[in-house]
């Protein structure tokens, strides 16, 4: 504003800007105050106007709401009146329906009474009818007597006819009355049904009307509800509008206030922009320095975090390996115990086998009978079988235990892998999060820098303004001095942190070295344990082979025993066959006697049966003839009765008379029926007579058979043909029996051979399965080891890179290009560790007796001592020796390296005719040593 005003006045730049005097300054202040008051009053005026407008709109809305509520109130009143009216109508209808129901109930009661009366009347009439029928149904004998008398007394019959006609007339009259009453009842029922249908139709119409009314009522209620909802929505919107208006007024006021503040700040900014330009150069220089320091700090922080992560991983691996080691040691101790127990049992079994063999020899030497030998052999076999079963059971238990342990080991390894993968995943996620955190920190730092630069720029502008005004601030100088002091302090702090970090890095290097060392030791222990496990597996294989040999010996013994048993069986069978022949002949004799007695009893019973049947048939014939005579007499009686009935049962007056031909036909039909019955009875009699003749014939046949059977039991003479045939058949039977026994023996022998072959096949299969399982286990173990080595390779590369970087840094810090004392110490320790590893390998290899002898000869030839297994004391001594070597290295730097004595070992090749066990043992012990190896000492 000032510059524009001066340009309008054509003020030159060389001259100073005119400044107002004291009075003008006071006037300017007053003017500014008045302007502020004016602006405030204008703002208040605007607020009041807006409030008035909002109040007027609110009043309009309130009036509208009032009108809506009044109309709603009226609608509700009309609805209440209509509901009361409907309620009164419903009450009236209810009263009317109750009256109608009472009337209907009364009518129903009257109808029930009438119905009961009618039923009583019907029951009485039916009783009377039944009595009349009973009177009519006279007894046949009385009727016959009455007919005989009626022949003499026609007058009595006429009177009877009259009475019967009277009774018939009465019955007809009663039936007519009944029909009339039923007709009336049906008409009344029809009237009742029609009235019911009318009432139902009226009720349905009423229900429809009520439904329509309910629908209309519901629609009306819905309309009122919609009305209420709209009113509520309008009220809500009015409230929202009021709130919005208030908020708008408040926002406008705030906007005005902010506009004033912004104007003031713009003025202040214009003044400060000029001051900021001067300090930008200094800030850029300081920023460069700070950015360099930050970059160094971030690099050191990254290195520190990386080293910390590696330390954590190494610690976890150490803990895991130590726990695995303990578990393996426990398992190995258990397996050793089991193996020791098994060896003891094997020795016992061998001793037992020797005792059994001795007994066998003793038994064979003695001249005992075949049966005694067989019993002894059976006892011995039983004892041997028991022992073998026990051994098999124990072996099975041991195998199960071993299998379980192997499975547990595999499960633990799988768990370990899963945990390692989880840890790696969490580490990667942690690294990712750390990176994100670093990024965020960097961004916040950038924002702080920007803020700082802005503040600095504002301060520069303020200073420029003060300089333009001609004011010099001592506070600025003090602030700058304070900032310089702060920066110096921060520099000192950074230096101290740098020194701390360097010391920590050194410590970490030392820790890393010790961890590597311990890791190497753990690996050695692991390898030794694996070798021991392989040796145990070999021992188990050997024991299994010995067991298979024992089984083969046992099978041979069993075969010999079976042969002896066969001989005994043959002798017994010969004995039994002779005894059986004698017994069979005696039994046959007894059986024939029993059969004779049974046959005689059967014949007696059969005779008695036939006689009883004949009696029954004669009785039936007599009964039939008596029935026939009775029926003839009945026919005569029926004829007489028929003649009487024809006279009595004359048709009444008004009915047609039945002709004589009708009765003749009826009589002929009855005669035919009787004739048929007579024919059927004759046929039955003829049939019974034929059966009697047939039974007599069968009796004769049975008698002839019995006589033949008696003759067959007579003694046969040696000169007869039957005797010769008997002898021939017996010889054929004997030859057939011998053939059958031979075949049975052959079948048994074949079955035994098959069984033995199956047993051997099962044993071989079992051995093959075991071998396959072991092979798979070994393959999985090898695969796991390969995997572990592959996993460790990137870590090793990373560590080597880190070591190289750290070496370079240390050399830079020490300002040397040659190897430092620390590096030389590390190399020395590595060489010592390498020597220890070779010693340990040699010790592990020398556990085998053959290899130990070879090593001993070669070492004695070269005048060297054999390496021994080291304990914890040797480790401590090695550490002390490494320290002493480190000290000695300080003095000796340019000496020549010591000469190494080389031993060339040549192992003798195994002969070709060696068994599998020796091969497996040699392969297990020499798994880590080649045929030719050079050892530097």
UniProtKB/Swiss-Prot annotation:
<dbReference type="GO" id="GO:0070286">
    <property type="term" value="P:axonemal dynein complex assembly"/>
</dbReference>
<dbReference type="GO" id="GO:0014004">
    <property type="term" value="P:microglia differentiation"/>
</dbReference>
<feature type="modified residue" description="Phosphoserine">
    <location>
        <position position="888"/>
    </location>
</feature>
<keyword id="KW-0175">Coiled coil</keyword>
<feature type="coiled-coil region">
    <location>
        <begin position="165"/>
        <end position="339"/>
    </location>
</feature>
<dbReference type="GO" id="GO:0061512">
    <property type="term" value="P:protein localization to cilium"/>
</dbReference>
<dbReference type="GO" id="GO:0060285">
    <property type="term" value="P:cilium-dependent cell motility"/>
</dbReference>
<dbReference type="GO" id="GO:0021987">
    <property type="term" value="P:cerebral cortex development"/>
</dbReference>
<dbReference type="GO" id="GO:0003351">
    <property type="term" value="P:epithelial cilium movement involved in extracellular fluid movement"/>
</dbReference>
<dbReference type="GO" id="GO:0071910">
    <property type="term" value="P:determination of liver left/right asymmetry"/>
</dbReference>
<dbReference type="GO" id="GO:0005829">
    <property type="term" value="C:cytosol"/>
</dbReference>
<dbReference type="GO" id="GO:0007368">
    <property type="term" value="P:determination of left/right symmetry"/>
</dbReference>
<dbReference type="GO" id="GO:0007420">
    <property type="term" value="P:brain development"/>
</dbReference>
<dbReference type="GO" id="GO:0040011">
    <property type="term" value="P:locomotion"/>
</dbReference>
<dbReference type="GO" id="GO:0097729">
    <property type="term" value="C:9+2 motile cilium"/>
</dbReference>
<keyword id="KW-0597">Phosphoprotein</keyword>
<dbReference type="GO" id="GO:0030317">
    <property type="term" value="P:flagellated sperm motility"/>
</dbReference>
<dbReference type="GO" id="GO:0022010">
    <property type="term" value="P:central nervous system myelination"/>
</dbReference>
<protein>
    <recommendedName>
        <fullName>Coiled-coil domain-containing protein 39</fullName>
    </recommendedName>
</protein>
<dbReference type="InterPro" id="IPR033290">
    <property type="entry name" value="CCDC39"/>
</dbReference>
<dbReference type="Pfam" id="PF24161">
    <property type="entry name" value="CCDC39"/>
</dbReference>
<dbReference type="GO" id="GO:0007507">
    <property type="term" value="P:heart development"/>
</dbReference>
<dbReference type="GO" id="GO:0071907">
    <property type="term" value="P:determination of digestive tract left/right asymmetry"/>
</dbReference>
<dbReference type="GO" id="GO:0090660">
    <property type="term" value="P:cerebrospinal fluid circulation"/>
</dbReference>
<feature type="coiled-coil region">
    <location>
        <begin position="365"/>
        <end position="615"/>
    </location>
</feature>
<dbReference type="GO" id="GO:0042551">
    <property type="term" value="P:neuron maturation"/>
</dbReference>
<dbReference type="GO" id="GO:0061966">
    <property type="term" value="P:establishment of left/right asymmetry"/>
</dbReference>
<feature type="compositionally biased region" description="Low complexity">
    <location>
        <begin position="873"/>
        <end position="887"/>
    </location>
</feature>
<dbReference type="GO" id="GO:0001947">
    <property type="term" value="P:heart looping"/>
</dbReference>
<dbReference type="GO" id="GO:0005576">
    <property type="term" value="C:extracellular region"/>
</dbReference>
<dbReference type="GO" id="GO:0060287">
    <property type="term" value="P:epithelial cilium movement involved in determination of left/right asymmetry"/>
</dbReference>
<dbReference type="GO" id="GO:0051649">
    <property type="term" value="P:establishment of localization in cell"/>
</dbReference>
<feature type="coiled-coil region">
    <location>
        <begin position="664"/>
        <end position="816"/>
    </location>
</feature>
<dbReference type="GO" id="GO:0030324">
    <property type="term" value="P:lung development"/>
</dbReference>
<dbReference type="GO" id="GO:0007399">
    <property type="term" value="P:nervous system development"/>
</dbReference>
<keyword id="KW-0969">Cilium</keyword>
<dbReference type="GO" id="GO:0044458">
    <property type="term" value="P:motile cilium assembly"/>
</dbReference>
<keyword id="KW-0966">Cell projection</keyword>
<keyword id="KW-0963">Cytoplasm</keyword>
<feature type="region of interest" description="Disordered">
    <location>
        <begin position="866"/>
        <end position="937"/>
    </location>
</feature>
<comment type="function">
    <text>Required for assembly of dynein regulatory complex (DRC) and inner dynein arm (IDA) complexes, which are responsible for ciliary beat regulation, thereby playing a central role in motility in cilia and flagella. Probably acts together with CCDC40 to form a molecular ruler that determines the 96 nanometer (nm) repeat length and arrangements of components in cilia and flagella. Not required for outer dynein arm complexes assembly.</text>
</comment>
<dbReference type="GO" id="GO:0036159">
    <property type="term" value="P:inner dynein arm assembly"/>
</dbReference>
């Amino acid at each position: 504003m000032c510059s524009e005003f001066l340009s309008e006045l054509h003020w030159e730049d060389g001259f100073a800007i005119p400044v107002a005097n004291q009075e003008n300054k006071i006037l300017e202040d007053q003017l500014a105050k008045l302007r502020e008051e004016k602006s405030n009053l204008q703002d208040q005026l605007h607020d009041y106007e807006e409030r008035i407008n909002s109040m007027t709109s609110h009043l309009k809305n309130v009036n509208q709401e009032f009108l809506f509520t009044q109309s709603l109130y009226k609608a509700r009143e009309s609805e209440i009146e209509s509901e009361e009216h409907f309620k009164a109508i419903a009450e009236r209808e209810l009263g009317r329906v109750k009256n109608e129901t009472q009337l209907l109930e009364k009518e129903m009661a009257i109808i029930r009474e009438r119905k009961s009366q009618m039923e009583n009347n019907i029951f009485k009439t039916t009783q009377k009818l039944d009595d009349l029928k009973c009177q009519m149904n006279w007894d046949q004998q009385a009727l016959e007597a009455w007919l005989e008398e009626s022949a003499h007394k026609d007058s009595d019959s006429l009177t009877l006819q009259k009475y019967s006609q009277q009774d018939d007339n009465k019955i007809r009259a009663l039936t007519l009355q009944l029909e009339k009453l039923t007709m009336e009842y049906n008409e009344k029922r029809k009237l009742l049904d029609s009235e019911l249908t009318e009432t139902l139709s009226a009720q349905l119409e009423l229900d429809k009307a009520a439904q329509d009314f309910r629908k209309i009522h519901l629609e009306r209620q819905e309309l009122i509800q919609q009305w209420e909802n709209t009113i509520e929505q309008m009220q809500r919107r009015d409230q929202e509008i009021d709130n919005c208006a208030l908020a708008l007024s408040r926002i406008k006021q705030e906007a005005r206030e902010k506009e004033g503040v912004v104007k003031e700040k713009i003025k202040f900014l214009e003044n400060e922009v000029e001051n900021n330009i001067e300090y930008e150069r200094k800030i850029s220089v300081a920023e460069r320095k700070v950015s360099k320091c930050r970059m160094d700090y971030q690099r050191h922080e990254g290195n520190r975090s990386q080293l910390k992560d590696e330390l954590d991983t190494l610690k976890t691996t150490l803990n895991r390996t130590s726990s695995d080691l303990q578990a393996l040691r426990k398992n190995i101790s258990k397996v050793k115990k089991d193996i020791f127990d098994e060896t003891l049992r094997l020795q016992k079994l061998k001793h037992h086998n020797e005792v059994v063999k001795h007994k066998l020899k003793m038994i064979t030497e003695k001249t005992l009978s075949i049966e005694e030998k067989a019993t002894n052999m059976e006892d011995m076999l039983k004892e041997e079988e028991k022992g073998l079963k026990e051994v098999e059971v124990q072996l099975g238990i041991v195998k199960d235990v071993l299998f379980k342990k192997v499975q547990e080991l595999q499960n633990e390894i799988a768990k370990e892998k899963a945990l390692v993968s989880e840890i790696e995943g969490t580490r990667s996620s942690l690294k990712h999060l750390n990176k994100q955190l670093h990024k965020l920190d960097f961004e916040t730092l950038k924002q702080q820098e920007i803020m700082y630069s802005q503040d600095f720029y504002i301060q520069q502008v303020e200073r420029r303004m003060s300089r333009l005004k001609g004011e010099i601030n001592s506070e600025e100088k003090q602030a700058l001095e304070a900032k310089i002091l702060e920066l110096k302090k921060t520099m000192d702090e950074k230096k101290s942190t740098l020194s701390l970090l360097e010391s920590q890095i050194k410590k970490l290097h030392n820790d890393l070295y010790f961890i590597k060392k311990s890791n190497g030791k753990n690996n050695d222990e692991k390898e030794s344990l694996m070798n021991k496990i392989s040796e145990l597996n070999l021992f188990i294989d050997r024991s299994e082979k010995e067991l298979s040999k024992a089984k083969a010996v046992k099978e041979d013994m069993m075969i010999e025993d079976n042969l002896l048993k066969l001989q005994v069986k043959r002798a017994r069978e010969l004995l039994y066959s002779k005894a059986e022949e004698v017994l069979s002949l005696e039994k046959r004799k007894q059986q024939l006697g029993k059969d004779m007695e049974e046959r005689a009893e059967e014949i007696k019973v059969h005779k008695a049966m036939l006689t009883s049947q004949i009696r029954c048939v004669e009785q039936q014939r007599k009964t039939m003839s008596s029935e026939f005579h009775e029926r003839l007499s009945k026919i005569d009686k029926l004829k007489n009765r028929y003649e009487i009935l024809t006279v009595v049962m004359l048709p009444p007056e008004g009915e047609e008379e039945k002709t004589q031909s009708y009765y003749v036909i009826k009589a002929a039909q009855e005669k035919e029926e009787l004739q048929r019955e007579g024919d059927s009875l004759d046929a039955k009699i003829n049939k019974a007579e034929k059966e009697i003749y047939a039974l007599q014939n069968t009796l004769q046949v049975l008698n002839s058979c019995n006589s033949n059977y008696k003759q067959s039991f007579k003694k046969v003479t040696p000169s007869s043909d039957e005797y010769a045939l008997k002898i021939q058949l017996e010889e054929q039977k004997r030859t057939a029996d011998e053939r059958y026994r031979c075949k049975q023996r052959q079948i048994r022998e074949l079955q035994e051979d098959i069984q033995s072959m199956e047993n051997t096949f099962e044993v071989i299969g079992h051995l093959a399965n075991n071998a396959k399982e072991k092979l798979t286990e070994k393959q999985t173990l090898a695969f796991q080891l390969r995997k572990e080595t592959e996993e460790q390779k990137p870590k090793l590369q990373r560590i080597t890179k880190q070591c190289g970087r750290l070496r370079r840094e240390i050399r830079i810090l020490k300002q040397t290009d040659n190897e430092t004392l620390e590096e030389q110490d590390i190399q020395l320790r590595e060489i010592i560790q390498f020597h220890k590893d070779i010693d340990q390998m040699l010790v592990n290899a020398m556990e085998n007796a053959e290899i130990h002898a070879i090593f001993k000869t070669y070492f004695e030839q070269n005048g060297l001592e054999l390496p021994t297994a080291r304990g914890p004391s040797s480790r401590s001594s090695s550490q002390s020796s490494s320290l002493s070597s480190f000290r000695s290295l300080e003095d000796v730097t340019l000496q020549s390296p010591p000469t190494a004595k080389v031993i060339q070992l040549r192992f003798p090749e195994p002969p070709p005719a060696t068994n599998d066990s020796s091969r497996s043992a040699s392969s297990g012990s020499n798994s880590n040593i080649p045929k030719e190896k050079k050892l530097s000492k």
